[in-house]
Structures are given as structure tokens and as C-alpha cells.
Amino acid sequence: MDLGKVITAMVTPIHPEKDKVCKKRIHHLVNHLIENGSDGLVIAGTTGESPTLSHDEKIKLFRQVIETNDGRAKLIAGTGSNNTAETIAFTKEVAELGGIDAVLIVAPYYNKPNQDGLYAHFAAVAEASDLPVVIYNIPGRSVVNIEPETIIRLAALPNIVGVKESSGNLDNISKIIAETSDDFQVYSGDDSLTLPILAVGGNGVISVASHVVGNEMQEMIQAFERGEVQKAAQIHRELLPLMNGLFSVPNPAPTKYLLNQQGISVGPVRLPLVDLNAEQGTKLQAILEGLSK
């Protein structure tokens, strides 16, 4: 299964007055992303503020994205949690919606399982799931790192098709790529590491920056794949200040700020996250405007 090169970890549009997942804004955002470089979308992931979405809100979100997408982009639903049984049940429920291509399963957070526990968790979900599974390794948030040896073992299971690697450890990522099959897809979970991970054999990126520079992210990857490494490196350097700026305060507040400024209304972030203040917003806007100079 080819999930694409640029997969956007989509923000969740929230109505600013009603504090509800907003159907109209979802429709607008999905079309914007697909028309501007996104091969696929991750729905209800970290950038989608999944911890503050209820079960019913996630289902509503999935349904609306499926309807708007109409088969154009690959859809990956975030169905993971730190409860294996709950993850399995929710993944099965999402599979019944139709229109979802794969699920993203985050490393269990807070519980701090060891490597045997991590393997057993992902193996149980993969065995029970009708949808292909993408592992999500993000030790900065989940506290535990899925070691490359564990990911390599999991990659041998028939229903585990890839990993979103947000560890930032290129040595580990290189080992995963070297010791898994060619059809196991390794995605950068950090925009700034997209090009380095491509250079060691990765497939693409699950991106935040692609909300606002999706075409440029595509151009960078395509240039690299054509062998135009210097051009790809130049694009990387040009985009790097924005990639870093989007994490100047906790994600996805900066991304939502820029989208709202561009007329793509996605509303605020939910507490305990807070929106950018005026000074933060001005600095971020200046970074974006600097890209075109």
C-alpha cells in the first residue's frame, strides 16, 4: 500500500463560539489540503488535538473527512490510545465507516510499557484490525521510545505497513530502513528531518508544515527523487525557519494561527493548549512572509 509522499497531520477545525467540531470548516480545510500538495491526511492525530476530542467528535470528524475526500487522498485515522482493548475496539469501529485507508497507532503513553509490552500492544491491534496499521513513535510525548529492534520485529507482521518516526534519531531510523522490507514505509514525523530521512531511504513525511507549504514540500521531495539533490536542499533550507516556527509554542497553535490568518478558518485550539498571543503571531507571520522574498 502506497500512502503517498506528503501526508498532512490535519488540524481539527473547531467552531470558535460553539467549541464544537465544525463540519463546514472541515470541508473547506480538506479541500485546501488536497488541492495544495497533500497525498494523504492523518485525522485525529497529535496535530488534530486528539486528547481533547471525545469519541463521538472523532467519529463525526472521520465521517466528514471521508465524505469531503471522496476517495481523492489516502486517509489515516488516529485510533490509538494507552489502552490496548480500547484501541482495538475503536479501530474496529472506525473500519466499519468505510473510506479509511489505514490507522495510526501511537505508542502507549503514561503507562511506560517496556519493549515486550510495546510489541504485544501493536501486535494485538494489528491482528484484530481490518485496516493496515502505521506505528507512531513519538517518545517526546509518549515517554517511551519504540526501539528499532521492536519496530523491525513488528514490520514482519502482515498488517503493519509503516511507521511515523518522530524520535529524531537518524541512526535508529537508518537501522529500521536497512532491516525492513522495501514495502515497509518509513515516514518522517518531523518536517525538518524530511530530507535527511529521504536520504537514508525513507518514504516521505507526515507533515505539519504542509498546511501552509504543501506544494513546496512536494516540490522538495520530487526534486530529491529526480536526483536534484541541491535543489531539494535549497528548498529545505528555505522552509526550515517555518518548520521550526510552527513548533515555537505547542503544536498546533501556530498552524491554526496561520491558517486563520490566510482565511482558512479552523478556529482556536482547545484547553489546556492556548492560542498565540499578538507578539508570537507577528513573529510567525513574518517568517511565512519571508519565504516569498
Curated annotation (Swiss-Prot):
A GO cellular component entry from the record: cytosol
Annotated positions binding pyruvate: T47, I206
Pfam annotation, one family: DHDPS
Superkingdom classification of source: Bacteria
Pathway: Amino-acid biosynthesis; L-lysine biosynthesis via DAP pathway; (S)-tetrahydrodipicolinate from L-aspartate: step 3/4
Cellular compartments annotated: Cytoplasm
Keyword vocabulary terms for this entry: Amino-acid biosynthesis, Cytoplasm, Diaminopimelate biosynthesis, Lyase, Lysine biosynthesis, Schiff base
Swiss-Prot/TrEMBL GO biological process terms: diaminopimelate biosynthetic process; lysine biosynthetic process via diaminopimelate
Record has Amino-acid biosynthesis as a keyword: yes
Site, as annotated: Part of a proton relay during catalysis: T46, Y110
Active site: Y136 (proton donor/acceptor), K164 (schiff-base intermediate with substrate)
Family matches, as PANTHER family: 4-HYDROXY-2-OXOGLUTARATE ALDOLASE, MITOCHONDRIAL, DIHYDRODIPICOLINATE SYNTHASE
Subunit structure: Homotetramer; dimer of dimers.
UniProt record similarity statement: Belongs to the DapA family.
Identification of the protein by name: 4-hydroxy-tetrahydrodipicolinate synthase
Phylogenetic classification of the source organism: Bacteria, Bacillati, Bacillota, Bacilli, Bacillales
Underlying gene: dapA
